[in-house]
Structure formats: C-alpha cells, structure tokens
C-alpha cells in the first residue's frame, strides 16, 4: 500500500441520498490506494433544504475544505448557474453530477454519460452498434443516449411514454450527432423496432424494487440482442434475468453505477480507480442489502 499523504473530502448532494452506495465505493477505493478519503452524504430532505440551495451548499463546501461534490436529483440542472466552468459534454447535456472545487473555482462534469460509456466499452466490447432501441428519455436516459451516440451508434430509436419530451430529446441529440439518426418512437412501435435492433438499453424506473416488472414485452427479445439496464436495485431485474435466460449478452445496471463512481474518483483525485475492484465491492454491498432486505 502507498504511503500517500493526500487527503480528500468529498460529498453527495441531493434528495434521499443516505442509502447511496457511492460513498462506500469511493472510500474503499481511497483506502486501497492509501488515501485519506472521506465521502459524506448531504441529504437535502434530512436537512430540510430545497434543491435551489445547491449554490449556497457549494460555497459552504468550499469554505469547509471540500475537494468536490457529486450532485444528484433535484440539483443536476439547478447547479449549472453556480459553476465557473462546465465541461463541454456536461454543457451539451444540460446537467452536471460532479463538481470539482479547486482554487475557489467550481467546475462541473457529467459522469452519467461517461460512466455508461465506460460500462459499455468494458462490459460489451463487441456489441454491434448499428441500430439500438432505448427505453426512456429522461435525465439518465439523455446521458445514456449521448454515450451511445458517442460510442458510434448509427441509428438510435428513442422510446418514451412522454411523446413531447422524447421528440425534444431526439432533436437535440440529432443536432449534436449529425452523422447518426435519432428518432423519437412510441412503445406501440416496439414490435416493429426490435427485429431490426442490435441492442436494447433500458433507462426507466421499471424494474426497481419500488417499480417491479418489465419495461417491454419480453417475448420481443432474441438471443442475438445485447441488453443493457441501468437499474441496479435489484441488480438482477426481470429484464436482466430474462435476457440472460434467452442467451443475450447483458450489461447490468451496476456497471454504469461503478463507471460513474470510478470516473468521479478520477476527477476528484487525479488518480485512476480500479473499476474491476470497485465493481467487486459494489456487488458485495448489493448482496449485503439483499440479505438484510
């Protein structure tokens, strides 16, 4: 183990963040790398603070010596007005989930998109990317779609129950990636879309413990499809289980969660995290939750 002298104080700002696994992943990786690394959840609900207080919290974090903050709902857009600099990809997405505090300046990044991109590259390195169907065009869905197009997807069919949001998101993404086609679709079109698709990406709450079930008719899955889910509580969603049973290559939601954490760790410390080690720890944490549930 290294005898590094560096110490880091970081935090997670958002509603209901106390159960988050992110602090545990960061602190364990810091320990292994020989850092003094403390990661504190800052739960707005417990503090009785609105999302609009994020600017004040940034200033307080600076005064108290924080090196950076992760930002989650409802502050990913609200934080934008309080930053000195925003990374180009985060600016395009209109959302920041990681802020580095250095020399009194606040710089915003988005590791939602980079975390999924890293997960896709490591977990499904040989995935065909000609045509992909994505379910969900909300905040996380926007970042994932951006990552897919950055990775080289040529035709992205974006499906969301909110037709207006879906159309707006598709138009934005098409403007950023003129060499790819991005089309807003409806769930009614899935029986026609899936036979043409190489892969399926799921970015809605369906499958979470509080929203059980599958996000589409699972009979539409074929063994030739690859399937990615961003839900990780539980890690084996109904979609993930059925896709594996059909012989699909599968990327579970834990991959993106670890990818986000590893990239944020790098931004905060300047050191590369060991993503495989972080995933092993993440799976330990999830398994422990399932035992106590």
Swiss-Prot record:
Its EC number is 1.1.1.25. It catalyses: shikimate + NADP(+) = 3-dehydroshikimate + NADPH + H(+). SUPFAM superfamilies: Aminoacid dehydrogenase-like, N-terminal domain, NAD(P)-binding Rossmann-fold domains. InterPro entries: Aminoacid_DH-like_N_sf, NAD(P)-bd_dom_sf, SDH_C, Shikimate_DH-bd_N, Shikimate_DH_fam. It comes from the Bacteria. One of its GO terms (biological process) is amino acid biosynthetic process. Keywords: Amino-acid biosynthesis, Aromatic amino acid biosynthesis, NADP, Oxidoreductase. The keyword Lipid biosynthesis does not apply. Belongs to the shikimate dehydrogenase family. Involved in the biosynthesis of the chorismate, which leads to the biosynthesis of aromatic amino acids. Catalyzes the reversible NADPH linked reduction of 3-dehydroshikimate (DHSA) to yield shikimate (SA). Homodimer. NCBIfam families: PRK12549.1 (NF009201). This is Shikimate dehydrogenase (NADP(+)). It comes from Arthrobacter sp. (strain FB24).
């Amino acid at each position: 183990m290294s005898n590094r002298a560096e110490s880091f104080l970081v935090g997670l700002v958002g509603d209901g963040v106390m159960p988050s696994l992110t602090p545990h992943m960061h602190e364990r990786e810091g320990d292994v790398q020989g850092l003094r690394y403390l990661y504190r959840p800052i739960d707005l609900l417990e503090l009785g603070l609105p999302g609009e207080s994020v600017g004040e919290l940034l200033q307080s974090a600076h005064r108290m010596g924080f090196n950076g903050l992760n930002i989650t709902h409802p502050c990913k857009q609200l934080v934008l007005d309080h930053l000195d600099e925003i990374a180009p990809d985060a600016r395009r997405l209109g959302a920041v989930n990681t802020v580095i505090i250095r020399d009194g300046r606040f710089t915003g990044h988005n590791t939602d998109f980079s975390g999924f991109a890293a997960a896709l590259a490591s977990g499904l390195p040989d995935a065909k990317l000609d045509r992909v169907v994505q379910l969900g065009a909300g905040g996380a869905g926007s970042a994932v779609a951006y990552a897919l197009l950055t990775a080289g997807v040529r035709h992205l069919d974006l499906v969301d129950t909110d037709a207006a949001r879906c159309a707006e998101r598709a138009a934005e993404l098409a403007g950023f990636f003129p060499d790819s086609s991005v089309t807003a679709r409806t769930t009614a079109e899935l029986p026609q879309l899936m036979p043409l698709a190489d892969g399926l990406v799921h970015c809605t709450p369906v499958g979470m413990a509080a929203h059980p079930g599958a996000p589409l008719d699972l009979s539409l899955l074929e063994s030739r499809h690859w399937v990615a889910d961003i839900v990780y509580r539980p890690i084996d969603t109904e979609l993930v289980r059925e896709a594996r049973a059909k012989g699909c290559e599968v990327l579970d939601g834990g991959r993106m969660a670890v990818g986000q954490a590893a990239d944020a760790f790098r931004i905060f410390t300047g050191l590369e995290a060991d993503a495989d080690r972080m995933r092993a720890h993440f799976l330990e944490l999830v398994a422990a939750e399932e035992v106590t549930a």
